[in-house]
């Protein structure tokens, strides 16, 4: 015999939670806007303006994530109720178990949509840039920066985000000195914004012939891509623009022209650079776009003391600004802000970061 009342209570609970989300996420307005966007994308001349078409496509994906999920929730809950009625009438435990399994799947889907309420910031839905900088410590720190780069690239891949290496400076022996990665996808900045800070590694160094334990630091800094229509005034006199040859491993594909571009904003000391295109003009445009994004983020941080402290972390690679500790010898990774801890260090280094990110977002960091 199976208990039907607890399942009916769950259906009622999910129905109420869905209704709350419909209001909070403005379902009716989003559904109407989705119809408008679909109509625009069906126009034969829409691709005459590729940037606008791409923006509409991105908007459609974001709208569908809300509208389609809530539509599926409504239909799914009705279907589960129907299955339960059949199970009771036929006294069929197999049908009952099928209904419960469908209900479990619906609850997980709803929980994912509820989590999007964490993304309430103005730019949470934007694409973003991730800067990783090796701290002092030479080869060991540079290898750690490379491990972080791999970890974030794996994480982004697992979430279906697109990644692009904008600039990378290789280490002298191993690893990297720094890297800038562009991460594109739905709520990329919202997902990654709490990852800004210093990451501490403790391990027996493979670069130490004595096998001694070393502590290394690398910093991560996340900032949103700013739309071109955002008004950020940059005085050309405040900029120093340098061009240089693209670094590479050698061979016939090395770029022998000075196409790489580095831009320094003298008043703030902010530096952006790009070398991923053979065209100096395109690299300069990309570096200016990053500069605009960084200056916008700096303005946002001036209005928010907590974010300002986060920006300070970027230049303070040491004990005081750590967000996470990776102690590989003890098989322990711990987030120092939320207390979330795991023993599965390899999974985390392979990109399994959601438990840390979700906890920090829920904590309002």
From Swiss-Prot:
Gene Ontology terms describing biological process: translational termination; viral translational frameshifting
Consequence recorded when altering residue 200 to C: About 50% ribosome rescue activity with ArfA, initial rate
GO cellular component terms, A-Z: cytosol
Species for this entry: Escherichia coli (strain K12)
Subcellular location: Cytoplasm
Gene Ontology terms, MF aspect: translation release factor activity, codon specific
Subunit structure: Interacts with the ribosome. Recruited to stalled ribosomes by ArfA, in the presence of truncated mRNA, ArfA influences RF2 conformation so RF2 can hydrolyze the peptidyl-tRNA bond. Biotinylated tnaC mRNA can be detected in a stalled 70S ribosome-RF2-TnaC-tRNA(Pro) complex.
Primary localisation category: cytoplasm
Entry-linked Pfam families: PCRF, RF-1
InterPro entries linked to this entry: PCRF, Pep_chain_release_fac_I, Pep_chain_release_fac_I_sf, PrfB
Mutation effect (residue 252 to E): Loss of methylation. No longer allows ArfA to rescue stalled ribosomes
Signal peptide: none
Annotated family: Belongs to the prokaryotic/mitochondrial release factor family.
Misc. comment: The gene for this protein contains a UGA in-frame termination codon after Leu-25; a naturally occurring frameshift enables complete translation of RF-2. This provides a mechanism for the protein to regulate its own production.
Residue numbers of N5-methylglutamine PTMs: 252
Alphabetic keyword roster: Cytoplasm, Methylation, Protein biosynthesis
Protein's job: Peptide chain release factor 2 directs the termination of translation in response to the peptide chain termination codons UGA and UAA. Acts as a peptidyl-tRNA hydrolase. In the presence of truncated mRNA in the 70S ribosome, ArfA and RF2 interact such that the GGQ peptide hydrolysis motif of RF2 rises into the peptidyl-transferase center (PTC) and releases the ribosome. Recruited by ArfA to rescue stalled ribosomes in the absence of a normal stop codon. A TnaC-stalled ribosome binds RF2, but the active GGQ motif is prevented from engaging with the PTC by TnaC.
Motif (GGQ motif): 250-252
Record's protein name: Peptide chain release factor RF2
PTM entry text: Methylated by PrmC. Methylation increases the termination efficiency of RF2. Is absent when the factor is overproduced.
Domain of life of the native organism: Bacteria
């Amino acid at each position: 015999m199976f208990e039907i009342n607890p399942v009916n209570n769950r259906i009622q609970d999910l129905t109420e939670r869905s209704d709350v989300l419909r209001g909070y996420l403005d379902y009716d307005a989003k559904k109407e806007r989705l119809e408008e966007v679909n109509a625009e994308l069906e126009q034969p001349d829409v691709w005459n303006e590729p940037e606008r078409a791409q923006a509409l496509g991105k908007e459609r994906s974001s709208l569908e994530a809300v509208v389609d999920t809530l539509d599926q929730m409504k239909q799914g809950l009705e279907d589960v109720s129907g299955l339960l009625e059949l199970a009771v009438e036929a006294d069929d435990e197999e049908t009952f178990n099928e209904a419960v399994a469908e209900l479990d799947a619906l609850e997980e889907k709803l929980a994912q949509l509820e989590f999007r309420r964490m993304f309430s910031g103005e730019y949470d839905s934007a694409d973003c840039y991730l800067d990783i900088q090796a701290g002092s410590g030479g080869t060991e720190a540079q290898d750690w920066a490379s491990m972080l780069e791999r970890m974030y690239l794996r994480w982004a891949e697992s979430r279906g985000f697109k990644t692009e290496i904008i600039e990378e400076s290789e280490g002298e022996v191993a690893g990297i000195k720094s890297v800038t990665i562009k991460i594109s996808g739905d709520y990329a900045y919202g997902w990654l914004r709490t990852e800004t800070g210093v990451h501490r590694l403790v391990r027996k160094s493979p670069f130490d012939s004595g096998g001694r334990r070393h502590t290394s630091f690398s910093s991560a800094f996340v900032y949103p891509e700013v739309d071109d229509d955002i008004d950020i005034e940059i005085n050309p006199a405040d900029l120093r623009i340098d061009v240089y040859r693209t670094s590479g491993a050698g061979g016939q594909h090395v770029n022998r022209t000075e196409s790489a571009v580095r831009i320094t904003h003298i008043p703030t000391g902010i530096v952006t650079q790009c070398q991923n295109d053979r065209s100096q003009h395109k690299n300069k445009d990309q570096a200016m776009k990053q500069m605009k994004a960084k200056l916008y983020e700096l303005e946002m941080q001036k209005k928010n003391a907590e974010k300002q402290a986060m920006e300070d972390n970027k230049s303070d690679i040491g004990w005081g600004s750590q967000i996470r500790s990776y102690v590989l010898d003890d098989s322990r990774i711990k987030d120092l802000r939320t207390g979330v801890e795991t023993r599965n260090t390899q999974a985390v280094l392979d990109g399994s970061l959601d438990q840390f990110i979700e906890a920090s977002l829920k904590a309002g960091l």
